[in-house]
Amino acid sequence: MEPVYSWGNTHLDFVDPEIYDLIEKEKHRQCRGIELIAAENFTSVAVMEALGSCLTNKYSEGMPGNRYYGGTEFIDEIESLCRSRSLEAFHCNPEKWGVNVQPYSGSPANFAAYTALLQPHDRIMGLDLPSGGHITHGYYSSGGKNISATSIYFENLPYKVDSKTGYIDYDKLEEKAMDFRPKLIICGGTSYPREWDYARFRAVADKVGAFLLCDMAHNSALVAAQEAADPFEYCDVVTTSTHKSLRGPRAGMIFYRKGPKPAKKGQPEGEVYDFDAKINSAVFPALQSGPHNNKIGALAVALKQVMAPSFKVYAKQVKANAACLASYLINKGYTLVTDGTDNHLILWDLRPLGLTGNKVEKVCELCYITLNRNAVFGDTSFLAPGGVRIGTPAMTSRGLVEKDFEKIGEFLHRAVTITLDIQEQYGKVMKDFNKGLVNNKEIDEIKADVEEFTYDFDMPGFFISESRND
């Protein structure tokens, strides 16, 4: 049998040089590029150490103190600490709120919450995908095809933004809800740049007798830092992923109300919330088996960092950087959905330029600027939508401030100008457009400028000098 030191204690670069080299290339890409995908961030070396720790070895079905495996003494302590830190980080009273930290990521957290609250074919209302919602909030394609499990197992009617302003049309939301009578209303999204009126959502939910769930995956850092409206004041359940603005590992959390319900007309006296058992059993055994203990340990570390005073400074800067970049692009004459932002992201409408998001995404990628194509209201194609989404958390984590985001705005302006020139010369068809990307000197110039620009900023998680590709 092969000795343990041989297979078990040999480093990656020797065991698998191919994977090691690809990781080094990805490390170089992250270091030398401008990361503007709103759903991405850079986590800390402390979180990475927990992710790569011996916690990955342990299996632990069940909840702390009630496991189906032995040897979970320290795993129980870690998960209990993670749960208590979750509540503290989001300013939740543990007598009124519980939390499950076992979901593998944000999408499983959402579906576990639906499984706990609903029966198959119950009705859901979430923000329409082209309006800024998420695919797990229920979405049908224009042909009526079910896109996600949410739309397969539940009946969905989306609410939308106003076509002129880009803001959520709360009056139409209420009108639809009164007709549709959903059992669950979802607030939260992936590309909505404005604040959420949770009080209005609560009022609508109460009118139709619906649960109210907030998916705060994108702006959870702003909520924790009290730089955004608080969904916990109005919602029954709050879900989130943990790797976006929160800067944690790829995991998920479900917060839920517990204890006595507030007095309400027509409600029996002394009634209590029953979410605790339903949500915990929906996560396990209904949808998952053993939790990923390395992620839970890493999340506990990230939450400790969230509670540090420096995290609030970071959250404030995320918003300031987004506002600065939005102002720069508007001053250049570009069109932003809602004419700006209240949070960490910008939705850039490229349709007035005659461009599609996939073309701008491709040119930016070649310039070492990473962003993503994104639907804007009225789009019918998600492969070639009319916009791009831009987020500020990742580069804020590297220490960039307003003046640096003005420089990023300049890079984006140059990239879009190149995109327009290529389209004019080669045409709108993508296979023809791609010909203009080959050996393009202007793209190479931006790429070189971007690499020089990013060189001065530290990289969370590792030292740039340690990369083999530098």
Swiss-Prot record:
* SUPFAM superfamilies, per database record: PLP-dependent transferases
For this protein, the Enzyme Commission number is 2.1.2.1
* UniProt keyword list: Cytoplasm, One-carbon metabolism, Pyridoxal phosphate, Transferase
Q: What Gene Ontology cellular component terms go with this record?
A: cytosol
List this protein's GO terms for biological process: glycine biosynthetic process from serine; polar nucleus fusion; pollen development; tetrahydrofolate interconversion
Stored InterPro entries: PyrdxlP-dep_Trfase, PyrdxlP-dep_Trfase_major, PyrdxlP-dep_Trfase_small, Ser_HO-MeTrfase, Ser_HO-MeTrfase-like, Ser_HO-MeTrfase_PLP_BS, SHMT-like_dom
Its UniProt pathway annotation is: One-carbon metabolism; tetrahydrofolate interconversion
For whether the record's keyword set contains Oxidoreductase, the answer is no
- N6-(pyridoxal phosphate)lysine occurs at which residues? K244
Which cofactor(s) does the record list? pyridoxal 5'-phosphate
Q: Which residues cross the membrane?
A: none
CDD domains in the record: SHMT
> What's the chief localization of this chain?
cytoplasm
Tell me where in or outside the cell this protein is found: Cytoplasm
Entry keyword annotation includes Transferase = yes
A GO term for molecular function: glycine hydroxymethyltransferase activity
Q: Please list the reactions this protein catalyses.
A: (6R)-5,10-methylene-5,6,7,8-tetrahydrofolate + glycine + H2O = (6S)-5,6,7,8-tetrahydrofolate + L-serine
Q: What does this chain do?
A: Catalyzes the interconversion of serine and glycine.
How does the record describe its quaternary structure?
Answer: Homotetramer.
Q: Sorted alphabetically, which NCBIfam families does this protein's record hold?
A: PRK00011.1 (NF000586)
Record's HAMAP family? Answer: SHMT
Indicate the family of this protein: Belongs to the SHMT family.
Indicate what this protein is called per its UniProt record. Answer: Serine hydroxymethyltransferase 5
Native organism is Arabidopsis thaliana (Mouse-ear cress)
